Swiss-Prot record:
<keyword id="KW-0436">Ligase</keyword>
<comment type="function">
    <text>Converts 2-succinylbenzoate (OSB) to 2-succinylbenzoyl-CoA (OSB-CoA).</text>
</comment>
<keyword id="KW-0067">ATP-binding</keyword>
<dbReference type="Pfam" id="PF13193">
    <property type="entry name" value="AMP-binding_C"/>
</dbReference>
<dbReference type="GO" id="GO:0009234">
    <property type="term" value="P:menaquinone biosynthetic process"/>
</dbReference>
<dbReference type="InterPro" id="IPR010192">
    <property type="entry name" value="MenE"/>
</dbReference>
<dbReference type="InterPro" id="IPR000873">
    <property type="entry name" value="AMP-dep_synth/lig_dom"/>
</dbReference>
<protein>
    <recommendedName>
        <fullName>2-succinylbenzoate--CoA ligase</fullName>
        <ecNumber>6.2.1.26</ecNumber>
    </recommendedName>
</protein>
<dbReference type="InterPro" id="IPR045851">
    <property type="entry name" value="AMP-bd_C_sf"/>
</dbReference>
<dbReference type="GO" id="GO:0008756">
    <property type="term" value="F:o-succinylbenzoate-CoA ligase activity"/>
</dbReference>
<comment type="similarity">
    <text>Belongs to the ATP-dependent AMP-binding enzyme family. MenE subfamily.</text>
</comment>
<dbReference type="Pfam" id="PF00501">
    <property type="entry name" value="AMP-binding"/>
</dbReference>
<dbReference type="InterPro" id="IPR042099">
    <property type="entry name" value="ANL_N_sf"/>
</dbReference>
<dbReference type="InterPro" id="IPR025110">
    <property type="entry name" value="AMP-bd_C"/>
</dbReference>
<dbReference type="GO" id="GO:0005524">
    <property type="term" value="F:ATP binding"/>
</dbReference>
<comment type="pathway">
    <text>Quinol/quinone metabolism; 1,4-dihydroxy-2-naphthoate biosynthesis; 1,4-dihydroxy-2-naphthoate from chorismate: step 5/7.</text>
</comment>
<keyword id="KW-0547">Nucleotide-binding</keyword>
Amino acid sequence: MSETTPHWLTKRADLSPDKKAIEFEDGSSITYLELFHRSQSYARKLGKLGFRQGDHIAILSTNCAEMIQIIYACSYLGAVAVLLNTKLTINELNQQLLDSDAKVIITSESFKASEFVLQRMDYNELESVTEDTSIITLKSEIYFDDIFTMMYTSGTTGFPKAVQQTFGNHWWSATSSALNLGLHDNDKWLIPLPLFHVSGLSTMLKSVIYGMPIYVLEKFEVEKVHNAIMDRKVTIVSVVTVMVQRLIKRLGNHHYPNDFRCMLLGGGPAPKSLLEQAKLKNIPVFQSYGMTETSSQIVTLTPEDALKKIGSAGKPLFPAQLKIAHNENNPNQIGEILVKGPMVTKGYYKRAETNKEVFENNWLHTGDMGYLDEQGYLYVVDRRNDLIISGGENIYPSEIENVLVQIEGIEEAGVKGSPNEEWGMVPIAFIVCSRPISENEIAAHLEKYLAKYKRPKEIHVVNELPRNAANKLVRHNLGK
């Protein structure tokens, strides 16, 4: 029988009715009681329109109060919230709407109804629906085995797959994070990442489970994030590597307030040089490792280890397990990362064959490559699918990228494999520069730090690198 708890938002509204739940950049805020009432109101409106338990309701929106309320409305209805990426083309969105079996798509006003393959409602249209309390009974309890949300993987390999996330997955993710980072009375978590991304969504849910206010930005902007940390009493922020780079540059010779205690870094390995810069400026960067399939981070450094184990993602969170395929007793040997725990997805929606391939005795094959050191700390090397095999040698793009960004004036770097008749594949690089840099300068630096077979055979200067909505580098789009 599935484990149950009182509905999280109902419970939080009872425990902390007048406490701020969400703050926005325009200065407005919502209490937990207000969030409870508004979410239940949307649930009754959806019920009036005929949506019921088990229905899939797609949401396409930038970060805003309505999006948060409708996600919680789905939980009161017993519906599954399908969270879609606003950067996708209409064709990609329609593919996911059909694949997810969504009954409706709810959007902000900027998306036109005529473009979608199914019924579309914007926030104003849903708001205008009258409530009817007699039609449905809203959920008072949460069943951990029930699917709460679905979000699509970024699709770096083939057609994106919908990851099913249960209430239990989200609960264990939130409580495990609290056991690692701790909870402080003054905590306020900044969300500059999209709520349709697992990092943004998981922090939104932590707010209700912890009773901790969140500060929500519509999108990442350096100045707004900087000001929030400096002036809005933010103590924790979730970031990816490119955000850290830009925030360090914006900070200059200043320092963050003493209450700012954690910059939680996800989205892939970060250059060691960047982490050293952060350490010099006393910026508390905690590397982590996680994915949509693990409902946010599953491996994180502790506050005690953040400055001692630079470059490591840490150890598995309390209820989680991790191993390296075929290398369980061999430290420092690179292999595929496997994870297991109550925050790991049940599987991909309508992908029975894929689920058989990626799950082995409840261990999830992540497709990421890494190794454990002698103390059991994880070091993530790269995506297995980004691996470049050149003349039989394994080349990891992130290693080359890390060396390139050590050159003063190279702000960002991306590396991918390119077909080559002699070697099969060779690395080529794309860089974003803040000053003119000669080929000789780059070549001299690479020669010092990389074996010859790892050095890029081509280097292209570009204005920007392709990134997804979470600002993660999309290597297969380099050069397109």
